[in-house]
Amino acid sequence: MNLNRRGFLFGSAAATAVAATAQNCCKLGTRKLAAGEKANVAMIGLGIQGRTALLPQFLAQYDIGAKVTVCCDCDKERREDGAKRVNDFYSKKGIPSACKAVADFRDVLKDPMIDMVCIATPDHWHAYIAVEAMKAGKDVYCEKPLTFSIDEARKVIAAQKKYGRVFQTGSMQRSWPVFRTAAMIVRNGLIGDIKYVDANYGRGGQKLGGPSHPIRFFDDPKNAATESAPNPNVDWDMWLGPAKWRAYSDQLAPRGVNKFYPMFWRFDDDFGTGYNGDWGAHHLDIAQWGIDMDDSGPYKIIRSDEPYSTDLYHGGRRQFGMKMIFKSKKDGSDIELYHGPFGTWGTVFYGTKGVVAVNRGKIAVWEGEVGKPTAEIRQALADMKPVAGLTVVAASVGKDYGTDSSDKKDDRLTATIKTLSDKYQLETASVQLYKSPNQVENFVKCYFTRMPTISPAEVGGRGSILCGLCNMSYVYDTGFGWDPVKMDFPEGCSCRKMGISLKREFCRNGWEVVV
């Protein structure tokens, strides 16, 4: 097993300097592994994401040194099902396994034999468990969005710096070749200076999907999380955790091992962060990567002027159209990031010499300039129709979704990525972005090398802040100033005068995040 730095970490001079600093902060694990011993992984949260997306990936890391030994969930059926899946997987490979099913994550964090945890709970639990895990000396993989609130994002960032743990945010698109290719073209200035960026997600307020921002569902009886007969297999008080007490609901916590998606809790403002925290956490993350803002953020938020939604399910609020304005690190000029509904492309970068558009399983590059993009231009790009002033360089648009390895399985996409890499000489470009084969594999390798991951706490935390700023703009129907250094409202900001808080509205005693 060769886990040296050059084997999987690549960066520009600036990125290398940051990595070196981060390396010094990654302390050793709390226990020393014997020769041939595996690092023990605890899965916390065995819903559809933890069970079907993350557990198989962690099981696949056995050969590089990690073994799942605990499945933790406050739902008895889910944790026992998870433990059985683990034992069955290892048994088929002739590997001894006695995976434990644990009800309370606090018991997991007290266990000195656990080396790393994977957190795949609903959003409202992420920050508390992540910080407590780091305090306990565990390395942490946490699903996106990293946090429920902006204040929690600041605390998770501070906790990683304080406790020096290896930390990975589950923003797995960064580990996909198609997204890295797009970001490499942008970061190397190959389409000129970036002036505008689109992040497209959500349903534009249509009845087809949930709201961009979480809402108070009890305000709409037809869509409320209705009371249900108590589920004897769920510790409901633990499921609620820091959120307000409410009666058990089958909609919030569907019974047993199921395939229910999208999760109802995602759009309830006591538990989730809406589409901004769901898909926004992916496409805003790629925008953040492409414009080199992993350690910064916008300085101004501009209110949407799109129509209000007309149904209570979307809160009667605007669903897209807000903008975030960043200062370019190159020359201080403005970069406008727009939240749009033009769904073909997750992230679109508009430069002075071209356009790059990317999504899962698809990428397109045009040369030329369109200036400030209009709705007509955005729709034409989404439909792959001609746009005056632009010439297609290369495009592959035949596939919507896939796994981390999907890029390798789609021959058309692989060919397009190679065409772009060759044309723009990306392998020898001056800016080399972190190259990760897989988000989980990268995390496990970093456990052994003590190197920073591709999506450490600051990257994930900054991304969560973008999601939170989007939600704030829609919920309060406002624009405002932002201090990206302090990660706070600037003095005199209208939000301060309105009494808007960066903290969660309510937190039950005992579950406050304390660094």
Q: Model-predicted segments: where are they?
A:
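N-terminal glycine-/serine-/threonine-rich beta1-alpha1-beta2 phosphate-ribose binding loop
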Residues: 2-139, 154-166, 512
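Non-transmembrane alpha-helical segments in soluble domains
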Residues: 9, 83, 106-109, 118, ...
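A contiguous active-site-proximal alpha/beta segment in oxidoreductase catalytic domains
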Residues: 139-141, 147-233, 237-238
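Active-site rim elements
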Residues: 169-171, 225-226, 266-277, 305-313, ...
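Core domains of carbohydrate- and sulfate-ester-processing enzymes
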Residues: 198-256, 374, 379, 383, ...
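NAD(P)-dinucleotide binding in Rossmann-like oxidoreductases
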Residues: 326-434
